[in-house]
């Protein structure tokens, strides 16, 4: 791939340090620090980034919302699908109450984007208050507007089978979490015959929390970016959006995020596709993030 150039942000040398750090070394600013000055430098994606981004033109963003979540974190490791995670086995006992998908044809901006979002009725479990505050689905709403788990996952997997035939690629923020819970829920719903196909699609998917991608974003933007340093994947998604927001198109999902910070499955699935599209453009077109609004927070 030919070299591309973009403006990245490099911090000015600090000559008045009082914290004991070496003032001769430039500091890399945090995401919220907008005091850096632009400097032209080459940012060519390394081969491992190019390989991870892939060449598929059809992406399907996937997201789930759960009835609760655990705050426990483990050492960073690779999960069952080969992606990095800090989740332990207890995470995969979480119950899905909303699942959404958004299909994006990267080669045709005028193509209709197939999308849907399904609410699942709780069966023997309650939705935690903290979860409702995150995604807006209460126990009452889920019982009224939801459908049985088996019905929802059967609809979902039929769509996935059709998209797989079109060589669509899964794009998920924290793939091990979402894909692992979906895999477990397929068994819970008595739909084990879908698991092999789902696992195959997940292994070939793209995780927007990949540390290699995070390091490359840091090079492009001149800002520290550790996707796994946040307490939850939701915070990591918000940080990713903050970094890429000047480049993300104005759409309902982005407006919803900026307006009320609700993380519904359908909106987050669309955001996953937009992040993937932006990263692909950064790699192929040398998209200049730093020149656009100085990475202003949304």
Regions found by a protein language model. Give the residues of each.
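Entry/capping segment at the start of metal-dependent catalytic domains
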Residues: 4-12, 20-112
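Metal-dependent phosphoesterase core characteristic of DEDDh/y 3'-5' exonuclease domains
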Residues: 50, 57, 92-139, 160-298
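A generic local structural motif
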Residues: 45-48, 154-158
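Metal-dependent phosphoesterase signature
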Residues: 134-156
